[in-house]
Structures are given as structure tokens and as C-alpha cells.
């Protein structure tokens, strides 16, 4: 982890650069670039005013009265544009977009996103430290500023699941030694922190000792549990469940990473914040997870800003949360504000409703114009990410549970979110359990080569009637081979299609593959273009509608990718069985009684 990224923010304090900026600001030398005729949104006051901006290298040398200076090597006509700082995404996972970091950068920079805080824990869960090293190397030469975080919970629920790696505090410390790593990523093992588990305590303390961020995942925490979680040194949360939860977390003193991936809650969040009469300085914005078709169609953090404004948030509040507040959270005073002496990350938006970027400047360079990249984006070798699915072909019987007797009582997992334990009775036919009426099957097979790859099968209630099967290696957070279905035949067919592809997603119905998305890199991403990936993923979505009827907001396609997230409260299927983080126990086989 000795590799370092660009040495920011200290690069702005180069004496020669500062001297040039001072000289240009006095009017004794021309600017490198002069932006004229635009209206500047001040992210401190929220006011909009006419102003011209002079740049010297990566530095803003002058913010001055319109048309008072005309001397510059390059002049940008910003007439009709609103100027803001570059947008900052405070919590996200590139892997959720299923494309490489280079392709992701090419997608969001033209939309005005100049900085992301990337938790590469998907790569970490599959490849261990080598995956994080690859992410650092991939980010190094990209024009999109990527502040990486050290994945804190690999796996997310130790003892309840097996990932491709197991990070302890010494590994976190190694990652934190890299200047490219800005802190410890979302601490999802909430119970471990609250109960003083030595592993999690040491991981949090590693971040504190490094003087870097320690980020949280405080879903459902309140009262003594929330206090214990925060007392450890964790300072942020993006796992909000309601407007009341948002207000409670703000009052508690957490930095909020308001995420766009739960759109059904955004309206309520806007109403709560509007009721305060001001935007708290601890409200930032993030995307968390954006699927490829959503990224292609709507964008990244710009889409979150756009939706918040559509739901009634003041545009200046949304921009402030996405820029100034975010920069303060990251301890990056050079970002988030278009002001003299700060870094020249500037976006020229057409308006403050649709937020279409006409021009994007990052570090004093024009990186995108009218939706197109203006600088090269370097893709590094992806060979280290292949061959991550270590499983043989599976058979129909691998997706059946054998049992003696005539009837059985089985444990079930009830509801797609906020899961609960349930029970059901069903019959045994030809030596195998018949899935209980109204249930769907879920199977998780370890695919990282650390233990056997035998599928562990459970029964889901509240998931509707499945008329086929869906297999995915994108399955948070250990990303084992996960299959949902209504019959063993289609489940085996979908699973083998994904295994043959080296990872990805497949939908099967009536003995045929309806749709396929190969993800041969880590079983998570592809080196195909975003356009092609989005098209294939949209095909998966469409095929899914043939085999299951969704019922928003909880029974939705996205629920398939979080059904194995064992760090969340309640029962969840893993490669070890049905796991419960509260009790710390795993039920390897769902059969409770036979008669």
C-alpha cells in the first residue's frame, strides 16, 4: 500500500503556484483561464451574483466584478450559466454500477461530479487486499478525484458468512498508510462495535489513530445502542429509515450522507429539513449504489441533487450539501467553494432545476464539455479480477433439501426488508422437501474457494410467487453465488449460466435463459461500455418481470442484492445457512421437525 495518489491538498501550496496566483490577482500578469459572464452560486451564503473568475493552474486566483478583467490565455464565455463548485459524492461503491472505475469516471465527470468517496468493499470482499490495491491503482491516473476508504467489514458478519477475504485491524492499518485512502469505510458490524468486540474495536481505533475518517452504517440504531456506536468514534450514517430517524441522527450529531438510492424516502427527508428552516452543516449527499441503467439514464450525484430539488428542496441547499458541506466533512477546505485561494473545481450548469453541465473544470483543467469528456481516461489492466467464481456446475438436486418422513416444519425468512423469523409446514415428496405454499426459494453457494461450494437453501415468504429463477454473483456483501427461484430446474440453469460466464446475472424461465449479463471481473463488473452494460442490465430487469410480481417499496428488484446482507438485524440467508446477527447463530438447515 505504498502507492500514493496526487498529493492533494498540499499541491495548492506550492510557493511558485501561489506567487503566480497573487501576481495575476493583482493584475500584473494574465490568468491562465478566465470565466466570464456567468452567475456564481455562493455555497456559504446561498446567494447568486454576477462574477468573473480567474484561474492560475489548479488555483482560483480571483473572483471579481464582471468584465473588470479581460487578460487571460483562455477565456470561457459562461453567459447564461450558473457556476457552482464540483459536486462531491460522500459515499458510494463504483462496483454497483458494474463498470470499471475508468468507465464510471467517464460517466459522471461530464455531469459535474468531480469528487467521489469510494468504498471498494465489493472488490475487497472478493479479492482481499489485492482488490483494494487494484482499486487504488485504477483511481490513480483518472481525472475524477477518488478518495478511497478502507473496507471495514470484510466480511460484514464474521462467523455468519464467508467472503473471499477477512480483514483485521492490521490490514486496515496497512490500507490507511496510503495517501489515497481517506479513512475507514462504513462500519456495518454494528453489533460488534456496540458490544465491544475486539476485532471491530481495533478496526475503528486504527482509523482514529491514523487521524482519518471513520464512517458509519447505523441502520435502526437508537438510544443506548446509537450512543455506544458513536462513542466508539464513528461519525456518519447513510442508513436512514424515516424522517424521524433523519432528525434523530442529526440531533445526535452524526454527519448525514443523504443517499439517492432510497428514492421513496427523499420526499420525507426534504419535508423534515424544510421544517427546520435551514440546512444543517452536517447534511451531505451520496449515491451509495447506482445500477448501470440508472447511471446511464439519470447520472450520479447530479441525479440526487436534481431529485431533491424536484421534491421541494431549495436548489442552493442541495448544492451546498453536495459541495461545501461535503468538503467540510472530508476536511478538504480546498473544495466545495468557488472562492479565491481554493481549488478550481467549477461546474457551469444550465440552470438549477435540471442541472445539466455545460462545462466541467477540475483542478483548473477543462475535463468535460456539453456531456463529452475532453481529456483521456486511462483503463488499467483488469486481468487480476478474472476467474473469481470457483464453483463446479450444479445440478437440480443441489437446489433441493432432502428429508425423511412425510411432513416437515421449516424455518422461513419473512419479508424482503426488516426480515423476521417465520415457520411453515409442508410435505416431503420423493425424499425432498416441497417448498411451503406461498414461498420462494433462496440459495447461497460459497464461490471464493475458502470452503465447500454446497448451496445452502432457505425459504422466503413475502416475496411473491416465482415463476422461474434469478442468479447473481452481485450479492451483498460477500458476493457469493445467490439464486432465487420457484423451482430447482430453473435455479440450476440460471446458476450454471452465471458460473460459465465467470460471474454475473441470469434469468431462467421454463427451462431457458431469458436474459444474461456477464460480469467476468470479480463477478461484479465488466470492461464493456456503460451503454452496453446498461442495456444488458435493463434486459435483466425486463426478464425479471416475467418471473415475479414486484410490490414497492420493499419487494423490488433491488431487494435481491441485499437479501444476504447478514450484518442487518433479522434472519438472512448466507453460504453458511440462515444467519441471525442478533443471536450470532446460523441455522445450517431450515428443517426444524420431521414426522
UniProtKB/Swiss-Prot annotation:
Transmembrane segments: none
UniProt keyword annotations, A-Z: Hydrolase, Manganese
Protein's name according to its UniProt entry: Adenine deaminase 2
GO biological process, one term: adenine catabolic process
Coiled coil: none
A Pfam family assignment: Adenine_deam_C
EC number per UniProt: 3.5.4.2
Cofactor requirement: Mn(2+)
GO MF entry, a single one: adenine deaminase activity
Catalytic activity from the UniProt record: adenine + H2O + H(+) = hypoxanthine + NH4(+)
Protein family: Belongs to the metallo-dependent hydrolases superfamily. Adenine deaminase family.
Gene3D superfamilies cross-referenced by the UniProt entry: Metal-dependent hydrolases (3.20.20.140), Urease, subunit C, domain 1 (2.30.40.10)
Species per Swiss-Prot/TrEMBL record: Rhizobium johnstonii (strain DSM 114642 / LMG 32736 / 3841) (Rhizobium leguminosarum bv. viciae)
Superkingdom of source: Bacteria
Amino acid at each position: 500500500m505504498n502507492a500514493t495518489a496526487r498529493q492533494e491538498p498540499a499541491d495548492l501550496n506550492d510557493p511558485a503556484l501561489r506567487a503566480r496566483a497573487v501576481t495575476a490577482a493583482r493584475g500584473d500578469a494574465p490568468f491562465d483561464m478566465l470565466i466570464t459572464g456567468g452567475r456564481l452560486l455562493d455555497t456559504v451564503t446561498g446567494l447568486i451574483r454576477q462574477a468573473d473568475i480567474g484561474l492560475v493552474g489548479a488555483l482560483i486566483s480571483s473572483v471579481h466584478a464582471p468584465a473588470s478583467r479581460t487578460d487571460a490565455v483562455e477565456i470561457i464565455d459562461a453567459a447564461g450559466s450558473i457556476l457552482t463548485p464540483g459536486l462531491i459524492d460522500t459515499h458510494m461503491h463504483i462496483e454497483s454500477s458494474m463498470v470499471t472505475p475508468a468507465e464510471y469516471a467517464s460517466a459522471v465527470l461530464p455531469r459535474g461530479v468531480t469528487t467521489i468517496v469510494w468504498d471498494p468493499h465489493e472488490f475487497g470482499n472478493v479479492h482481499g487486499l489485492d482488490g483494494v490495491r487494484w482499486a487504488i491503482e485504477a483511481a490513480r491516473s483518472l481525472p475524477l478525484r477518488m478518495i478511497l476508504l478502507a473496507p471495514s467489514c470484510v466480511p460484514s458478519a464474521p462467523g455468519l458468512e464467508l467472503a473471499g477475504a477477512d480483514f483485521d485491524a492490521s490490514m486496515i492499518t496497512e490500507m490507511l498508510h496510503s495517501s489515497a485512502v481517506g479513512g475507514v469505510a462504513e462500519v456495518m458490524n454494528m453489533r460488534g462495535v456496540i458490544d465491544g468486540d475486539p476485532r471491530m474495536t481495533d478496526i475503528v481505533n486504527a482509523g482514529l489513530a491514523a487521524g482519518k475518517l471513520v464512517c458509519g452504517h447505523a441502520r435502526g440504531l437508537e438510544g443506548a445502542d446509537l450512543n455506544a456506536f458513536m462513542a466508539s468514534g464513528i461519525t456518519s450514517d447513510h442508513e436512514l429509515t424515516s424522517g424521524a430517524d433523519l432528525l434523530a441522527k442529526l440531533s445526535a450529531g452524526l454527519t448525514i450522507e443523504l443517499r439517492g438510492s432510497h428514492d421513496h424516502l427523499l420526499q420525507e427527508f426534504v419535508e423534515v429539513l424544510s421544517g427546520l428552516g435551514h440546512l444543517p452543516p452536517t447534511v451531505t449527499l451520496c449515491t451509495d449504489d447506482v445500477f448501470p441503467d440508472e447511471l446511464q439514464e439519470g447520472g450520479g450525484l447530479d441525479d440526487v441533487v436534481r431529485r431533491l430539488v424536484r421534491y421541494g428542496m431549495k436548489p442552493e441547499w442541495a448544492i451546498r450539501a453536495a459541495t461545501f458541506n461535503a468538503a467540510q466533512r472530508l476536511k478538504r477546505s480546498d473544495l466545495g467553494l468557488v472562492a479565491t485561494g481554493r481549488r478550481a473545481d467549477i461546474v457551469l450548469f444550465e440552470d438549477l432545476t435540471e442541472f445539466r453541465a455545460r462545462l466541467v473544470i477540475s483542478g483548473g483543467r477543462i475535463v468535460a464539455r456539453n456531456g463529452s469528456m475532453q481529456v483521456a481516461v486511462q483503463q488499467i489492466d483488469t486481468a487480476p479480477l478474472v476467474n473469481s467464481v470457483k464453483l463446479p456446475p450444479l445440478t437440480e438436486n443441489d437446489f433441493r433439501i432432502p428429508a425423511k418422513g412425510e411432513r416437515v416444519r421449516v424455518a422461513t425468512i419473512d419479508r424482503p426488508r426488516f426480515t423476521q423469523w417465520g415457520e411453515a409446514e409442508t410435505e416431503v415428496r420423493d425424499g425432498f422437501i416441497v417448498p411451503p405454499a406461498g414461498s420462494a426459494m433462496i440459495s447461497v453457494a460459497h464461490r471464493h474457494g475458502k470452503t465447500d461450494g454446497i448451496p445452502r437453501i432457505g425459504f422466503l415468504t413475502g416475496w411473491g410467487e416465482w415463476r422461474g429463477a434469478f442468479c447473481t454473483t452481485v450479492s451483498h456483501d460477500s458476493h457469493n453465488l445467490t439464486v432465487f427461484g420457484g423451482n430447482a430446474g430453473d435455479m440450476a440453469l440460471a446458476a450454471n449460466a452465471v458460473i460459465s460466464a465467470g460471474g454475473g446475472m441470469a434469468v431462467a424461465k421454463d427451462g431457458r435463459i431469458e436474459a444474461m449479463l456477464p460480469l467476468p471481473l470479480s463477478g461484479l463488473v465488466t470492461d464493456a461500455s456503460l451503454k452496453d452494460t446498461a442495456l444488458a442490465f435493463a434486459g435483466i430487469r425486463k426478464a425479471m418481470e416475467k418471473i415475479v410480481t414486484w410490490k414497492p417499496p420493499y419487494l423490488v428488484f433491488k431487494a435481491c442484492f441485499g437479501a444476504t446482507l447478514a450484518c442487518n438485524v433479522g434472519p438472512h440467508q448466507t453460504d453458511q445457512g440462515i444467519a441471525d446477527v442478533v443471536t450470532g447463530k446460523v441455522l445450517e438447515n431450515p428443517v426444524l421437525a420431521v414426522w
